[in-house]
Amino acid sequence: MNLNLRPASECKFDAVSLGEVMLRLDPGEGRIRTARSFRAWEGGGEYNVIRGLRKCFKMNTAVITAFADNEVGMLMEDFICQGGVDTSLIKWMKTDGIGRICRNGLNFTERGFGIRGAVGCSDRANTAISKATPDDFDFEYIFGTLGVRWLHTGGIYAALSEQSCETVLAAIKTAKKYGTIVSYDLNYRPSMWSAIGGQAKAQEVNKEIAKYVDVMIGNEEDFTACLGFEIEGNDADLKELNLDGYKKMINEAAKTYPNFKAVATTLRTVKTATVNDWSAICWADGEIYKAKDYKGLEIMDRVGGGDSFASGLVYGLMTTGDAELAVNYGAAHGALAMTTPGDTTMATKKEVEAIMGGAGARVQR
């Protein structure tokens, strides 16, 4: 497949993300409600993707976000710097000292174990990035003057506020103006859309955004809720994806949105919180490519696995243009990311490629 990427020589960044980055507070093996200490990480649905591109795949990336200008914001910046992601595009917003004007988001997340599923409890109302408008970012400068080869954003950020919807559209329209490839993860969260118009608003916004997207990421529920497409013959409990039905739906979506060059989703069957069957598929040029199956994958922390899949997928598409190879990069990277704590990857490209090639868990000496 030909994505017609901008040459690296004319762009400062290989990839940038647009979205919220939160402080993740992790009680480890315990529960949020009984914790006496938390381990801190950074994470965000859009940011995790470009963080993986930088840390695992050594691409030059930056994050477009906003923080309240206080100690917590500086902690977040420090985490991002440790991941190697450029912080020069962060908007720092004045605060009144108690968070009435704006604040930084918190995400309390339990990993789950066995029959006890993972639990997320986010505290993200009135955050700096949710209050940001298109005027807070100079997209002409970012995509025109600096140059960006790939923009990744998604439905979690779009659902934060009315302003977020507008900011996503402004960013992707400017990105397309300068030839930047756009990927978008639908990532439908009913609770996030409920305050700004519910599913009707989600469809209104996502149908407009979809007109500018080159690589769309989303499962069957996302496509139904956000874009109004249905899969025939799918399991009512959404435990197993009907691949023939998914392919038919994607072909229909591609007719509606001929700008789609690739569509991808992970395939996850939850046995327990710590054992999942895992794979992924990618549609491109009318064909469906399925990644290697990871049956009975043992998981330490599932949060961010889908974002790490997207990192590998984007890397594969950017460097090879081969959808089959790209979806295998994505599935392997996502699988490895779920074997370590935190939202973001601790894997190397060498490890990803070894897993793709069938390597096991023998001791490396």
Residues of each region from the PLM?
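Alpha-helix C-terminal capping segments
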Residues: W41, N48-N60, Q82, G316-T319
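Positively charged, low-complexity intrinsically disordered leader regions
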Residues: M1-R33
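Conserved phosphate/ATP/ADP-binding segment of small-molecule kinases
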Residues: R189-E287
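Conserved N-terminal subdomain of the carbohydrate kinase-like
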Residues: N60-G155, V352-R365
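Active-site nucleophile and cofactor-binding loops and adjacent substrate-binding regions
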Residues: S37-Y47, T65-D69, K91-I101, D301-G305, ...
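Conserved post-catalytic alpha-helical subdomain immediately downstream of the catalytic base
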Residues: A273, Y289-A359, R365
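Hydrophobic beta-strand scaffold residues
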Residues: T61, T87, V182-Y184, I217
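A short helix->loop->beta-strand "cap" motif at the edges of active sites that frequently abuts
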Residues: K58, K177-I181, Y257-K261
